[in-house]
């Protein structure tokens, strides 16, 4: 009888729905396991984040979880990395139709991972899939196409848009000058600042236009060999933004 009562009691306890864990508590578990150098435990916690993010369509948490999983899988077994990459590519492709902004953030993360980790994730294939968002012209950059699409541009240039994708998107240096938008993040990932200059000038954000100009010029200076056109461009930019105090 006591055994039966124990079984019933346990069954009742299991039936009680426990409070759902928050993303903060799940990431705290990830952080704790990581600091204890327990990659397998860290992966378990990251998969819990992934599961919750999929259910709630919280793509910043989802992308951060998936790419973090790759880093820890590399410590345990490189063979498992390919499966996670496949899941990333599949999800990014699915989102192209249902949530293009989220899909773009997958692309940004893929490029970042390739740039920083040397991992091949075929971000080029995803990049090509985005061509033609706006009024496509021969040789037009992806950033220019995104800005040409009014619907997409409105979402990417919205103030504090990066908050929609925390903790994936961390506020970068100078992000406040771009009003923490997403288009500057994409441009930074692609090193494609030229389309931003006209956009920020037209929208009245001259500080952002100045920073975009400086970064574009900085990229051009790499390999500089005394190009007179480059010197002239630098002089014109100095004159254009000479009134800015910061």
Language-model segments: residues:
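Positively charged n-region of N-terminal signal peptides that target proteins for export
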Residues: 1-4
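Bacterial N-terminal signal peptides
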Residues: 6-17
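Extracytoplasmic/secretory-pathway proteins
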Residues: 23-246
């Amino acid at each position: 009888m006591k055994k039966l009562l124990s079984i019933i009691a346990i069954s009742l306890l299991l039936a009680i729905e426990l409070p759902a864990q928050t993303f903060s508590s799940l990431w705290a578990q990830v952080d704790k396991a990581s600091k204890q150098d327990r990659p397998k435990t860290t992966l378990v916690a990251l998969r819990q984040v992934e599961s919750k993010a999929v259910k709630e369509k919280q793509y910043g948490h989802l992308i951060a979880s998936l790419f973090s999983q790759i880093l820890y899988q590399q410590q345990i077994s490189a063979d498992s990395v390919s499966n996670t990459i496949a899941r990333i590519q599949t999800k990014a492709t699915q989102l192209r139709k249902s949530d293009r902004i989220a899909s773009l953030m997958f692309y940004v993360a893929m490029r970042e991972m390739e740039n920083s980790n040397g991992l091949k994730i075929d971000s080029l294939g995803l990049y090509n899939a985005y061509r033609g968002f706006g009024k496509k012209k021969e040789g037009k950059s992806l950033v220019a196409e995104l800005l040409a699409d009014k619907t997409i541009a409105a979402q990417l240039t919205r103030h504090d848009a990066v908050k929609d994708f925390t903790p994936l998107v961390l506020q970068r240096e100078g992000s406040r000058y771009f009003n923490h938008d997403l288009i500057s993040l994409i441009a930074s990932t692609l090193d494609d600042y030229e389309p931003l200059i006209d956009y920020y000038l037209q929208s009245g954000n001259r500080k952002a236009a100045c920073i975009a100009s400086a970064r574009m010029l900085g990229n051009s200076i790499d390999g500089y060999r005394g190009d007179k056109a480059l010197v002239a461009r630098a002089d014109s930019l100095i004159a254009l933004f000479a009134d800015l105090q910061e």
